[in-house]
Amino acid sequence: MKWRVVFCVVMGVILVFSTAVADDYNPPDWRGDLGTTYAKWSFDDGTNPSGPETGWVNPFGAPTLEVTGQLPLTEWKADDLGHQGVWKFEDYIQIEIANYDIDNPIKEIWIQVTYQADSIGQGLPLEISTNPGLTSIELVDQEAVDAFYYSETYSVILSPNPSFETIFIEPRNCTAYVDQVVIDTICTVPEPASVCLLGLGGLALLRKRRA
């Protein structure tokens, strides 16, 4: 009897811990470096629009997140399949981030989303877009949190680096239930070799115009 109690307690702790880790299970290697920002939303209540959780990092002010749409298609739920604090929506999530006004050629945005949708397993049910428009996007990883929820990580590249970006997360022809969103950004400086190549490219273009 005691072993059964101990087993149940241990399994409960493992389940809670694994879910918590999965929410921010894949942070970028560069988190905390110079020129980075960080923000996380766990939707503990239905505040909308909302600021990030305590611990966010951004010298230009707190970013904001808004879940768009109206009841009954857009609705905050205190619990969904064992996940506390979830937004159900069919419209889109909009995140606005003020950022470094630096003349860099590249910005990377690292997006983690923990969610469930009725079309998971039939192609990617989420569409990620940005303003200004993204240069490239890559699905870095997708892992099952439990029998219903997944955590996905996206790497988005903007070029050149903007001082303000808006991120949109939109379901593709389905209803999504989002448990957590984590956003990291970094304004990157190219390697010296890349700078040299950019310079040579510009010089070649200048010579061509003169010719």
Feature locations, PLM:
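Short, threonine-centered small-residue motifs that mark membrane-proximal processing/anchoring sites
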Residues: 5-7, 12-23, 179-203
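N-terminal targeting leaders for non-cytosolic proteins
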Residues: 22-86
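Short beta-strands within extracellular/lumenal beta-sheet-rich domains
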Residues: 80-107
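A short beta-strand element within beta-rich, extracytoplasmic domains
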Residues: 102-118
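Short, surface-exposed beta-strand/strand-loop-strand elements in extracellular ectodomains
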Residues: 121-134
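Extracellular carbohydrate recognition and processing domains
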Residues: 132-160
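Short beta-strand-plus-loop segments that form exposed binding edges in beta-rich domains
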Residues: 168-176
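C-terminal membrane-anchoring or membrane-association module
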Residues: 205-211
